[in-house]
Amino acid sequence: MPTSNFFQINQIVQTIYHLKPNSLLDVGVGFGKYGFLAREYLELWDGRDDYDQWTRRIDGIEVFPDYLTPIHNIVYDNIYVGDALELVPALETHYDLVLLIDIIEHFTHDEGRRLLADCLRIGNNVLIATPKDITQQETTFSNPYERHRSQWQKWHFEKYEQQCQIDNTQSFIYLIGPGAAILDKKHPIIAR
């Protein structure tokens, strides 16, 4: 669906805020929630007085153009329409943070690993969230890409040298990359 589990919003936004990326790529923007929240908390909470002077780059990828609304054009600097498996390797921009929020389960494991590897090539850090218990999901909102194709587990992400799990009851949330060391192990969002 063009939305994601509301139980994970706090942990994801806290992680984005603590990393303070100057550039962010949101893969599978859907409703645009995380682009919107990143724009708000990275731009408006930095002590500035200029409300409409964005200093950070927030780009997105969306395979299903029917999800895009005029709000996306306000929040995102660029939205690339197409399959992330094709678009991510072709991107020339390097990002401080890449978001894969409730998207990796829409790929096979092989495709998901390839997408993650490509995201790690173009991004310093990748923030992933995927449901702990995947549900059967086929086409929704007339979008054939909404089908769940894989279930991911902790071990899929724990093999990365630079990673940390972010505590959540409903989702596996992992930060992969050097930013994992930035998040203090005593911080309440880190899983113990």
Regions found by a protein language model. Name each.
Residues 1-94, 110-117, 142-160, 166-192:
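Conserved N-terminal segment of class I S-adenosyl-L-methionine
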Residues 118-122:
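Conserved helix-to-beta-strand junction in the class I
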Residues 123-133:
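Conserved beta-strand signature within the Rossmann-like core of class I S-adenosyl-L-methionine
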Residues 135-140:
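A short acidic, helix-capping loop that chelates divalent metal ions and anchors anionic groups
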